[in-house]
Amino acid sequence: DQAVLDALKKGVEVKAFAAALKNLKAAGIATYVYLLFGTPAESPEAARRTLSFVVAHATEIGFLNLAIFNLPAHGPKMEGIASGTFYTGDLPLYRPFVHPLGWDRKEVRCFLEKEFKKEPAIAAILRRDPPFFTSNHAPFFVMASD
């Protein structure tokens, strides 16, 4: 979603991703798309716009990796984010946080399982992922199917 990318200061435009997917597909290069859900700037509506983008470009996406945002324990402070520790003495990589838009991890996970992954075009992409798969291996699976 463009508003999420802008809020997170990513410096990229969704239309550039669309063009890249199209051009990579035309060149015969497989894509492994990593999507991060539940960032502080994302709402359920924004996530649904991401779902629509993936559906619109499903024929150009080789593989998908879906992840849920974790707030880094020692990353930059994010304004308006209430965070804490998991327990006294904990040495975590991540901090628990209260999503500023009320979209907590449980709701994000529910959206992914009950809505995002249920979309037929997306489910077809997810079924292509081998059980032990990383983005480093994507080209080999595409080459094997040629």
Task: Mark where each language-model region is.
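A structural motif corresponding to the C-terminal lobe/cap of the Radical SAM core domain
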Residues: 1-146
